[in-house]
Amino acid sequence: MTDAPNTPADNAAAQAPQLRVLAQYVKDLSFENPGAPETLRPGQQAPAIDLAIDVQARTAGEDTFEVVLTVNAKASRDESVVFIAELSYAGLFQLANVGETDREPFLLIECPRLIFPFARRVLADATRDGNFPPLMLDPVDFAGLYRAQLAKRAAAAPGSESNGNGDPAAAN
């Protein structure tokens, strides 16, 4: 008797949500340094940084999804643009044992949380290579960003509740 019966713990582990990172990559990267070399002179005040972060998800196959984290940074000093950095960093994820209602939060909270450190490094390297101090992004509250997306969706459709069905296409 080498076959052991399945225990409840075995069944629970088999049904636990699983997330696999299949790939991660720079989808699009742009760095503009329009005022160089004037903006690179020593002794100038640090530029003000405007930052925008967005997350989108789309189906890429059966139980496979592409999640794109987009970061736009615009640095300005005295009403002139110092640099513009735009990054779309993506991950290809495989989900298993994730219900329809939980899929969207998984894709828009957990997946970007996993790829964020890599996107941050790419952006820091790009700004450093533009002869500026590396732009080190603070950690992002992806759950808060997701809640803001839900609120925006609910406001855009008065009288209707947010999708909530986990359809990643709704995140686009």
Curated annotation (Swiss-Prot):
GO terms for biological process: protein folding; protein tetramerization; protein transport. Homotetramer, a dimer of dimers. One homotetramer interacts with 1 SecA dimer. PANTHER family: PROTEIN-EXPORT PROTEIN SECB, PTHR36918. Its main location: cytoplasm. It comes from Maricaulis maris (strain MCS10) (Caulobacter maris). One of its GO terms (molecular function) is unfolded protein binding. Pfam families: SecB (PF02556). GO terms for cellular component: cytoplasm. One of the proteins required for the normal export of preproteins out of the cell cytoplasm. It is a molecular chaperone that binds to a subset of precursor proteins, maintaining them in a translocation-competent state. It also specifically binds to its receptor SecA. SUPFAM superfamilies: SecB-like. It is found in: Cytoplasm. Belongs to the SecB family. InterPro entries: SecB (IPR003708), SecB-like_sf (IPR035958). The gene is secB. Keywords: Chaperone, Cytoplasm, Protein transport, Translocation, Transport. This is Protein-export protein SecB. It comes from the Bacteria.
